[in-house]
Amino acid sequence: MKFSTILPILWANCCLCMIIPDFDGIVRFIENIDGTRSVRAGEGLGQHDPGNFHTEHQHVAHKTEFLPYRYVIVFNEDISLQQIQSHMQVVQKDHSTSVGKLTENDAFWRVISSSVSSKSQFGGIDNFFDINGLFRGYTGYFTDEIIKIISQDPIIKFVEQETTVKISNSSLQEEAPWGLHRVSHREKPKYGQDLEYLYEDAAGKGVTSYVLDTGIDTEHEDFEGRAEWGAVIPANDEASDLNGHGTHCAGIIGSKHFGVAKNTKIVAVKVLRSNGEGTVSDVIKGIEYVTKEHIESSKKKNKEFKGSTANLSLGSSKSLAMEMAVNAAVDSGVHFAIAAGNEDEDACLSSPAGAEKSITVGASTFSDDRAFFSNWGTCVDVFAPGINIMSTYIGSRNATLSLSGTSMASPHVAGILSYFLSLQPAPDSEFFNDAPSPQELKEKVLKFSTQGVLGDIGDDTPNKLIYNGGGKKLDGFW
């Protein structure tokens, strides 16, 4: 066991709402009792406005930035690759024909003409994704004519208009000495007491922690050389964090002074641009990358490899596609922690917080209350410190900053997932008996959390605060 004395969300919150127009033969608003709106495929007639969604609950309290004529198309699970290839070939051919009919006065032409050099190249399929065969689809720009045809193909599960995801700064320039102390103690700290973080020596060793965010300053000295770049998903972006959000989250997961899992390997997967903005499809591609990397690491049977975790401190309004991508990654063995959001509303109304197989994290305060901004509800699984959290930042090799948000709470849980995975016997040990699945570890983490201590929670929100065991024997955990 070790302890460290601690020196005295930015939730990637989109603040969006899905504006869902009627679209001839494709979607129709259905008003729900709770005031949300649903849309169904293949119903209704209406005037075109770029937007074709199929989802169960589209929250309309935020302002959504949807991308005109750009869509995420998801296949049914039970179709073959041959069917997928045939469908995509037909779509691309038909789209080229459709584009050839356009004039310079058409809205589709105006929307995307700045990004291509000739009319024959306008739009069409630009990305295919496949998360371990469990979640497959593609993205692209399509005309009204073609998106209607796509939506009516029986092998298509649903079509969702591409939307943006963003981060929303909520920084506080104050010392924040309490977060690590709280997750390693059952009792809340008292004002003025000495604070310490209690943990086992392994502390994430053998585990790879992926941070899907704005990138990471891998040269920051507090990462001790354990941070590296994995992928840059947004087109024409670079392997650097010019925002700071990703570096801060990574520090909470695994940096020397501010991290929960101080020996974990940290991998940057840039899904948000340096300005803090991104798209649902880029997040999905990032999840696909993480899943493939995890599967490859598992196949190598490295005796030191103990598993993969991932953190998503970002969000948008409801996106069934993004939540399905997360669930597919979890089913493939990746342990996910996700920020609940900062709107002081039901977390089930946003994505990916509503993904059922990940761990969705709300933010708590020093006094063990729900943070005033933290989302709540049945989609929240557990709470973690999210007010005035000190961590690594950009600007110099030893820069730090104190931030608040569910973005800061979620990495505490990602770090604890990495921490517990590292405490398992090595794969080549006689005591090794299969690493816990994400579902098994989720159940153990939630059961082991500190129960019933949080205030201002609400009747339908789990009253659970994350806990790492305090460096003690964990017989009660396993």
Curated annotation (Swiss-Prot):
Residues spanning the signal sequence: 1-17
Active site: D213, H245, S407
Top-level division of the source organism's lineage: Eukaryota
Induction record: Undergoes rapid but transient induction upon transfer to sporulation medium.
Keyword terms of this UniProt record: Hydrolase, Protease, Serine protease, Signal
UniProt entry tagged with the keyword Kinase: no
Domain Peptidase S8: 177-478
This enzyme's EC code(s): 3.4.21.-
UniProt family annotation: Belongs to the peptidase S8 family.
Protein purpose: Serine protease with unknown substrate.
Protein name listed in UniProt: Subtilisin-like protease 3
Species the sequence originates in: Saccharomyces cerevisiae (strain ATCC 204508 / S288c)
Gene that encodes the chain: YSP3
